[in-house]
């Protein structure tokens, strides 16, 4: 039993091992089958981020990708099912399939003679005629697919499940080879046979005309006998006209090649994204429509100029009217927009084409096979883009040559001259638009490269961020060298914009504002540009706010000259800060956008009203023609009513007066000059209803007419009433009433436009509400005509400017008022102090006057008792107010000055004759002497002093010995004023 169990256990283990090996083999086979797709044997590799996928043309960002070592194709893992068959394996499969098909078909034909009927080989491979029909009738390349040509069930025929297995395999292999052949035929069929077919189809409309313009010139295209009938000037003119039509035909062919061959092939065959194809061929549909229409007009003019019985001989005498219609009006505007867009994106389109050609192998193969054809040998993508860009520059040259040979017909010469002016204006506008679009693209590129957090402070204005750049237009830019205060040169990018100069630096492949010793944003207001005398490339930029001087250096002398010229032009055109603030807040930006939209809506409303007037005039003219007035010219439309740029267009009172004048003239025509309108008829708010009966009126010849709600335009009965004395035909009153009616309608519509604009204006000027507007309306009604005209003459642009000016004046007045208040307070304080000082000085003056009067009386009384000798030696010297130390000897005796006596409470002074010899006291000495009251108080009881004491005080000492005794007097006994008291004497 143990042996049997061991054998059983061994058998079970072997079965488990076999099952495990089988599962592993199946897994390996599944993994191999997963890698083997469409003949590709994919292996997993690691790639970098710059590797492009062959299937979707996108970068492979994953760490692992699939590569086929047979054909060296690297793709995403998700793109392996969309990849075409392997090129090297496909060739082997085709050869093997052909061999198998030949042997299989022979065996099938031998076996199926008795069982089934033989099927033709066209069921497997389409015949040449069928293939040509497919190529000739196709509009896309999807018609060659297997599903639309031959089906698998049709190939299998009536085979059932009992059919031999080998036959089914042969048929399936032949079907696969057919499917493979159809897939490879997609691009190759277009290149080998489809290009010429496509070209013939797209030029089928101009096939006959293209053959007529195969010759190089008109002289070679017409018959020689017909050529000899014309002068040399006519031949030159016709040669240029022939060249114009021929080059226009070639231009249309170029545009159709771009649209129908290249673009269609890229979209349908290469499955490229529409945005990429649009970047390669911008606005080609619009350009094709414009030039196809123009070419049709030129060819129609040629057919009209053909000689009878000939298809080659023609002479075009008039071409100016056709050129004027092409290069003016809506056609010119459409050409301007399309050519501006195309030419501005010309550089980007060429750059994109070169990038695609360098990195995309399928695109490169497509372009090579397309240009292999004889039709497209000289019409590659780059050549087509360049030809379209240069086409608009050829028109002025051709028209100028036609003009030089058109001196015979004056009207034609004037039309050609006008057309030449229009073409030059169009070319100038396109050039300007291209320049602006290029600058906008350049500004957007700089904006995208700037650091989002980059800001620079502007003195007194706040931070200047990168969003402020988009508010402005880029005028000029370039790299310069900025010389700093330390003498070093820094590379900067200088942007000349609408109102500022901006200095930028590049850091970590991003632009930031310069962080040097001076502001990086310079206002163009009062900016001075000067070149450096001793340097060929340097220039100074001197700004006034804040006062700074920048020294920059250009790359060359011509570059510096260009910078100086464009900066000076921009300084002259720089807007004011009231119209264009340096830094705009979000609220101001939103308000500006709203005002712009409001102006656009007003403009659209005015255009609609103008269109309304035109339609009304057309309707009235049509009714007049229906009424029997054949040959009546259409009424002229009133001009100048809908021009927003003129102040006169907004004077509603003038329009109303003109409307009333038209009503009076219309009344005179319909009712007669002697009939007055009733008061209700003058009011515009009372229209005549259709069912209100008839309104009697009197015509010019006295016949009664009835006007049922509208004016009937009818012809007069007799022709004699419509002729004057000279027999000239006169216009009937109804005909004369037509023009005033149109004028009246236009004036009323213009008045409506004025009312709407003024309402918008008042709403913008007075946001407080309707009460303010009612008050203003009442005030204006009292002011009279001058006030109404002033309010009506305000345009939205003018009111915005005046509002900004008023706000600026209000802020300035507020600042001036505050400054005046502070100055008034300072002046009031100063005036109070001056008044206090004035009162003190008045009191001191009155006191001094009283003292002087008292001293005069005392001197007069003293002079009567003992006059002072004027020749006294001590009277010749000035009075010393105080002595701290006394000299000894004769010098002290000779320099003695007696003290001034005092009597009572009054001070005794010297006589006027003696005092006039003394020098006046200065301020310090007067301070030391003190006031008269102080000096009088220092004396001890002046009433007890006798006259002898007074005389002794005034007499000099008798000898120098007395001076010796006087030296012993201590200084403490002297008075502060330098005068001895009565006790000391």
From Swiss-Prot:
Residue ranges of the region described as Interaction with DYNLT1: 131-161
Description of post-translational modifications: Phosphorylation of Ser-885 by PAK1 induces binding to protein YWHAZ, promoting its relocation to microtubules and the inhibition of its activity. Phosphorylated by AURKA and CDK1 during mitosis, which negatively regulates its activity. Phosphorylation by MAPK1 or MAPK3 increases nucleotide exchange activity. Phosphorylation by PAK4 releases GEF-H1 from the microtubules. Phosphorylated on serine, threonine and tyrosine residues in a RIPK2-dependent manner.
CDD domains: C1_ARHGEF2 (cd20877), PH_ARHGEF2 (cd13393), RhoGEF (cd00160)
Location(s), subcellular: Cytoplasm, Cytoskeleton; Cytoplasm; Cell junction, Tight junction; Golgi apparatus
Main subcellular localisation: cytoplasm
Pfam families found in the cross-reference section: PH_16 (PF17838), RhoGEF (PF00621)
Keyword annotations: Acetylation, Cell cycle, Cell division, Cell junction, Coiled coil, Cytoplasm, Cytoplasmic vesicle, Cytoskeleton, Developmental protein, Differentiation, Golgi apparatus, Guanine-nucleotide releasing factor, Immunity, Innate immunity, Metal-binding, Microtubule, Mitosis, Neurogenesis, Phosphoprotein, Proto-oncogene, Tight junction, Zinc, Zinc-finger
GO (cellular component) term, any one: postsynaptic density, intracellular component
First and last residues of each zinc finger (Phorbol-ester/DAG-type): 39-86
Subunit field text: Found in a complex composed at least of ARHGEF2, NOD2 and RIPK2. Interacts with RIPK2; the interaction mediates tyrosine phosphorylation of RIPK2 by Src kinase CSK. Interacts with RIPK1 and RIPK3. Interacts with YWHAZ/14-3-3 zeta; when phosphorylated at Ser-885. Interacts with the kinases PAK4, AURKA and MAPK1. Interacts with RHOA and RAC1. Interacts with NOD1. Interacts (via the N- terminal zinc finger) with CAPN6 (via domain II). Interacts with DYNLT1.
UniProt feature, compositional bias: Basic and acidic residues: 919-938
A Gene Ontology BP annotation from the UniProt entry: positive regulation of neuron migration
Biological role: Activates Rho-GTPases by promoting the exchange of GDP for GTP. May be involved in epithelial barrier permeability, cell motility and polarization, dendritic spine morphology, antigen presentation, leukemic cell differentiation, cell cycle regulation, innate immune response, and cancer. Binds Rac-GTPases, but does not seem to promote nucleotide exchange activity toward Rac-GTPases. May stimulate instead the cortical activity of Rac. Inactive toward CDC42, TC10, or Ras-GTPases.
Comp. bias intervals (Acidic residues): 940-949
Domain DH: 236-433
Stretches for region Disordered: 1-32, 890-909, 918-985
GO function terms (MF aspect): guanyl-nucleotide exchange factor activity; microtubule binding; small GTPase binding; zinc ion binding
Phosphothreonine PTM sites in chain numbering: 680, 795, 944
Residues the record lists as N6-acetyllysine modifications: 354
Name of the protein this chain belongs to: Rho guanine nucleotide exchange factor 2
Domain PH: 473-572
Phosphotyrosine, modified sites: 893
Modified residues (Phosphoserine): 109, 122, 129, 133, 137, 143, 151, 163, 172, 174, 177, 646, 649, 692, 710, 781, 885, 895, 931, 939-940, 946, 951-952, 955, 959
Coiled-coil ranges from the UniProt annotation: 591-615, 797-866
């Amino acid at each position: 039993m143990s042996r049997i169990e061991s054998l059983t256990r061994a058998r079970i283990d072997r079965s488990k091992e076999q099952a495990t090996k089988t599962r592993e083999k199946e897994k390996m086979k599944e993994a191999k089958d997963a890698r083997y797709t469409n003949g590709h044997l994919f292996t997993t590799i690691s790639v970098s981020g710059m590797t492009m996928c062959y299937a979707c043309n996108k970068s492979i960002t994953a760490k692992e990708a699939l590569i086929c070592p047979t054909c060296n194709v690297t793709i995403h893992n998700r793109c392996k099912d969309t990849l075409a068959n392997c090129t090297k394996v496909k060739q082997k499969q085709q050869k093997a399939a052909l061999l198998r098909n030949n042997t299989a078909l022979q065996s099938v034909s031998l076996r199926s003679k008795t069982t089934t009927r033989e099927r033709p080989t066209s069921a497997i491979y389409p015949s040449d005629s069928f293939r040509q029909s497919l190529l000739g009738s196709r509009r896309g390349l999807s018609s060659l697919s297997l599903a639309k040509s031959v089906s698998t069930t049709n190939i299998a025929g009536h085979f059932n499940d009992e059919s031999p297995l080998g036959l089914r395999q042969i048929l399936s292999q032949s079907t696969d080879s057919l499917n493979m052949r159809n897939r490879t035929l997609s691009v190759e069929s277009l290149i080998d046979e489809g290009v010429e077919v496509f070209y013939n189809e797209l030029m089928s409309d101009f096939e006959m005309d293209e053959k007529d313009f195969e010759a190089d010139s008109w002289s070679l295209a017409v018959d020689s006998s017909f050529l000899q009938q014309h002068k040399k000037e006519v031949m030159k003119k016709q040669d240029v006209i022939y060249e114009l039509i021929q080059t226009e035909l070639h231009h249309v062919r170029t545009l159709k090649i771009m649209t129908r061959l290249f673009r269609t092939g890229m979209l349908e065959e290469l499955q490229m994204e529409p945005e990429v194809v649009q970047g390669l061929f911008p606005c080609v549909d619009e350009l094709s429509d414009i030039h196809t229409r123009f070419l049709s007009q030129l060819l129609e003019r040629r057919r009209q100029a053909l000689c009878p019985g000939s298809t080659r001989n023609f002479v075009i005498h008039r071409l100016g009217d056709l050129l004027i219609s092409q290069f003016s009006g809506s056609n010119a505007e459409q050409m301007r927009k399309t050519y501006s867009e195309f030419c501005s994106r010309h550089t980007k389109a060429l750059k994109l084409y070169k990038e695609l050609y360098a990195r995309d192998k399928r695109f490169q193969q497509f372009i090579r096979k397309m240009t292999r054809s004889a039709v497209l040998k000289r019409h590659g993508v780059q050549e087509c883009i360049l030809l379209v860009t240069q086409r608009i520059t050829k028109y002025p040259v051709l028209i100028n040559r036609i003009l030089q040979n058109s001196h015979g017909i004056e009207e034609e010469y004037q039309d050609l001259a006008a057309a030449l002016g229009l073409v030059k204006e169009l070319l100038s506008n396109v050039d300007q638009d291209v320049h602006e679009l290029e600058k906008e693209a350049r500004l957007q590129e700089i904006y995208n490269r700037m650091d989002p957090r980059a800001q620079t402070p502007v003195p007194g204005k706040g931070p200047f961020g990168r969003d402020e750049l988009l508010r402005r237009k880029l005028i000029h830019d370039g790299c310069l060298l900025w010389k700093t205060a330390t003498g070093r040169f820094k590379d900067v990018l200088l942007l000349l914009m609408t109102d500022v100069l901006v200095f930028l630096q590049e850091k970590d492949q991003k632009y930031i504002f310069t962080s040097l010793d001076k502001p990086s944003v310079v206002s163009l207001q009062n900016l001075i540009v000067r070149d450096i005398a001793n340097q060929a490339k340097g220039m100074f930029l001197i700004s006034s706010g804040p006062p700074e001087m920048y020294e920059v250096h250009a790359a060359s002398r011509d570059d510096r000259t260009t910078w100086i010229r464009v900066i000076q032009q921009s300084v002259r055109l720089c807007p004011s800060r009231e119209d264009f603030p340096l830094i705009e807040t979000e609220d101001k930006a939103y308000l500006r956008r709203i005002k712009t939209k409001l102006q656009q809506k007003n403009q659209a409303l005015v255009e609609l009203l103008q269109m309304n007037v035109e339609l009304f005039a057309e309707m009235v003219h049509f009714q007049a023609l229906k009424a029997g007035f054949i040959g009546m010219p259409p009424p002229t439309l009133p001009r100048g009513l809908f021009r927003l740029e003129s102040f006169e267009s907004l004077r509603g009172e003038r329009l109303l007066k003109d409307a009333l004048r038209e009503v009076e003239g219309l009344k005179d025509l319909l009712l007669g000059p002697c009939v007055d309108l009733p008061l209700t008829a003058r009011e515009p708010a009372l229209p005549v209803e259709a069912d209100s009966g008839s309104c009697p009126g009197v015509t010019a010849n006295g016949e009664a007419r009835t006007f049922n709600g509208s004016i009937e335009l009818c012809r007069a009965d007799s022709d004699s009433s419509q002729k004057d004395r000279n027999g000239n035909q006169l216009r009937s009153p109804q005909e004369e009433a037509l023009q005033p009616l149109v004028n009246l309608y236009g004036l009323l519509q213009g008045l409506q436009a004025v009312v709407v604009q003024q309402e918008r204006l008042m709403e913008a000027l007075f946001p407080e509400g309707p009460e303010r507007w009612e008050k203003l309306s009442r005030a204006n009604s009292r002011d009279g005509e001058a006030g109404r005209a002033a309010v009506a003459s305000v345009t939205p642009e003018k009111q915005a400017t005046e509002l900004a000016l008023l706000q600026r004046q209000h802020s300035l007045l507020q600042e001036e008022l505050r400054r005046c208040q502070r100055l008034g307070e300072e002046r009031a304080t100063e005036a109070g102090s001056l008044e206090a000082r004035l009162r003190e000085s008045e009191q001191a003056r009155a006191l001094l006057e009283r003292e002087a009067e008292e001293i005069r009386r005392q001197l007069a009384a003293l002079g009567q008792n003992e006059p002072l000798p004027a020749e006294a030696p001590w009277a010749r010297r000035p009075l010393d107010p105080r002595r701290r130390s006394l000299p000894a000897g004769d010098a002290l005796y000779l320099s003695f000055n007696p003290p001034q006596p005092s009597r009572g409470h009054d001070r005794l002074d010297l006589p006027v004759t003696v005092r006039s010899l003394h020098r006046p006291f200065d301020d310090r000495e007067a301070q030391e002497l003190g006031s008269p009251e102080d000096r009088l108080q220092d004396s001890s009881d002046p009433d007890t002093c006798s006259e002898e004491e007074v005389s002794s005080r005034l007499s000099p000492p008798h000898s120098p010995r007395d001076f010796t005794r006087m030296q012993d007097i201590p200084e403490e006994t002297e008075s502060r004023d330098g005068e001895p008291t009565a006790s000391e004497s």
